[in-house]
A protein has these predicted regions:
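Short active-site oxyanion
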Residues: 26-32, 104-108, 156-157
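Class I SAM-dependent methyltransferase SAM-binding "motif I" and its flanking Rossmann-like core
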Residues: 95-153
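A contiguous loop/helix-start segment that scaffolds small-molecule binding in enzyme catalytic cores
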Residues: 2, 156, 163-275
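Glycine-centered tight-turn and secondary-structure capping sites
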Residues: 92-94, 251
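General beta-strand structural signal in soluble alpha/beta enzymes
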Residues: 34, 109-112, 159, 185
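Loop/turn-to-beta-strand initiation segments
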Residues: 3-5, 75-79, 155-156
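Glycine-rich, flexible N-terminal cofactor/catalytic loop recognition
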Residues: 1-58
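Conserved helicase motor
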Residues: 55-63, 136-140
């Protein structure tokens, strides 16, 4: 009988944030798959848990993933952890979860710490609709292309960023979204020096150019403001009907097409065309 996979979230800073259920799952698992076994070992030592650790990270996932699946299909239970937060979220565990589903293995996700949600809740930005964009590319061209694809995104956008890339990322964001776009920079969440700076992209660039950023950041960027739709006038309708008729359409067809294009009632377009 096949075993199970448990996705076990780990603290994003404060070790006191690990739940009793997570602790029990780690204790009862046959082995633990970890992104960095050195980081996970520190947590296990803190919890007083001795367990077999298997490394699973970006550069060995193709080989190790199959081996882990084989062990679970043979009846063992695996707990998957990342260095911090919920596994499989912007992390190599994503591919491992896909493998397990393809193999028909039962997957159980345990709720717990997640930097995305923690940052969003404390950001002061709109929380009703949001999108998580993960880490931006280290290559400027790819980073700009990613941001440009979000030019008209109206949902709140969330990104992870390292301190050494922060200023370059903020500069690209300002170039694409505008310097006045609101942003909340959430740093060292749940740790001793936790900080949330709610400002604009332009002001953030000034702040972190003068003061070198430290710690890991979650950037919560306000979405694009909703654009006001222009309402077509009777003159617009009359001009468009005339143009379409000059192109060969009958008056009836020109009125019908104009009404559709300008989102106006046919009778309004008809009256405008007769003026």
């Amino acid at each position: 009988m096949a075993g199970m996979l448990y996705l076990v979230p780990t603290p994003i800073g404060n070790l006191g944030d690990i739940s009793q259920r997570c602790r029990e799952t780690l204790e009862n698992a046959d082995f633990i798959a970890a992104e960095d076994t050195r980081v996970s070992l520190k947590l296990l030592n803190h919890l007083g848990i001795k367990k077999s650790l298997v490394s699973y990270y970006e550069h060995n996932k193709a080989f190790k993933g199959e081996k882990i699946v084989e062990r679970i299909l043979a009846g063992e239970t695996c707990a998957l952890v990342s260095d911090a937060g919920s596994p499989a979220i912007s992390d190599p565990g994503e591919d491992l979860v896909k493998l397990w589903h393809e193999a028909g293995i039962v997957v159980c996700a345990i709720p717990g710490p997640c930097a995305v949600i923690t940052a969003l809740s404390i950001s002061g930005q709109a929380t009703g609709r949001f999108c998580f964009e993960g880490f931006l590319s280290t290559a400027k061209k790819s980073r700009r292309e990613h941001l440009e694809s979000l030019t008209n995104e109206q949902r709140t956008m969330i990104f992870y960023e390292a301190p050494h890339k922060l200023v370059a990322t903020l500069q690209d964001m300002a170039a694409v979204f505008g310097e006045d776009r609101p942003i909340s920079l959430c740093r060292e969440l749940t740790k001793l020096h936790e900080e949330v700076v709610r400002t604009t992209l332009g002001s953030a660039i000034e702040k972190y150019t003068e003061n070198a950023p430290k710690g890991e950041f979650v950037l919560v960027v306000a979405g694009a403001p909703e654009q006001e739709k222009e309402v077509a006038t009777a003159d617009d309708a009359a001009a468009r009907v005339q143009q379409l008729m000059e192109e060969g359409l009958s008056r009836k067809d020109a009125i019908k097409q104009t009404a559709k294009e300008l989102n106006l009632p046919k009778n309004v377009v008809y009256d405008a065309a007769l003026q």
